[in-house]
Amino acid sequence: MTTTVKRRARIGIMGGTFDPIHNGHLVAGSEVADRFDLDLVVYVPTGQPWQKANKKVSPAEDRYLMTVIATASNPRFMVSRVDIDRGGDTYTIDTLQDLSKQYPDAQLYFITGADALAQIVTWRDWEKTFELAHFVGVTRPGYELDGNIIPEMHQDRVSLVDIPAMAISSTDCRERSSEERPVWYLVPDGVVQYIAKRQLYRPEGSDKDMDPKGQNQA
């Protein structure tokens, strides 16, 4: 009689400001899920990103709702409020500790941009994060992570995945929206409508209503 051993669940964790979430984030989640045979990808909007303490960031609820809208059509995607509800500055170590408690039997894969991964030694309790997850750096084709950045003892816990759509950036999407230039096909359709409805990313002092139909113009 053959005994089937059930493998541990594999869960991707993608943390980010998502201001706004764009198609590059979604393609990255899908590609990493396929590459590592993930059962689920959890998108985690930050509460207060510590790296952006002096920068203007959209309200957490707006960023959360845009992420929910963007991921709703993919049954392998879900959104967690764990960082928002915790309050205070968001640190990856806290995210991973909280989610490892929610999924105690799962193998976690933390998905982040390779440029952010290159700064990992500046993160709070960064060495402990390797005990909780395998790190996946998503990047544009041709990018190479400096081998000296990640200590040798942790290099087997890091993988890079090329994502062509990572050329899209949230910064560019915000700038285009503030100038009333189209962001269709850069962010999901529902997010385009949400940005227009909530009048996000308008210039300071602007009292001009954004025209959601204008986002249709090429």
From Swiss-Prot:
Its EC number is 2.7.7.18. It catalyses: nicotinate beta-D-ribonucleotide + ATP + H(+) = deamido-NAD(+) + diphosphate. GO terms for molecular function: ATP binding; nicotinate-nucleotide adenylyltransferase activity. InterPro entries: Cyt_trans-like (IPR004821), NadD/NMNAT (IPR005248), Rossmann-like_a/b/a_fold (IPR014729). Belongs to the NadD family. The keyword Cytoplasm does not apply. This is Probable nicotinate-nucleotide adenylyltransferase. It comes from the Bacteria. It is an enzyme of class 2 (transferase). It comes from Corynebacterium glutamicum (strain ATCC 13032 / DSM 20300 / JCM 1318 / BCRC 11384 / CCUG 27702 / LMG 3730 / NBRC 12168 / NCIMB 10025 / NRRL B-2784 / 534). The keyword NAD applies. GO terms for biological process: NAD biosynthetic process. Keywords: ATP-binding, NAD, Nucleotide-binding, Nucleotidyltransferase, Pyridine nucleotide biosynthesis, Transferase. Pfam families: CTP_transf_like. Catalyzes the reversible adenylation of nicotinate mononucleotide (NaMN) to nicotinic acid adenine dinucleotide (NaAD). Pathway: Cofactor biosynthesis; NAD(+) biosynthesis; deamido-NAD(+) from nicotinate D-ribonucleotide: step 1/1.
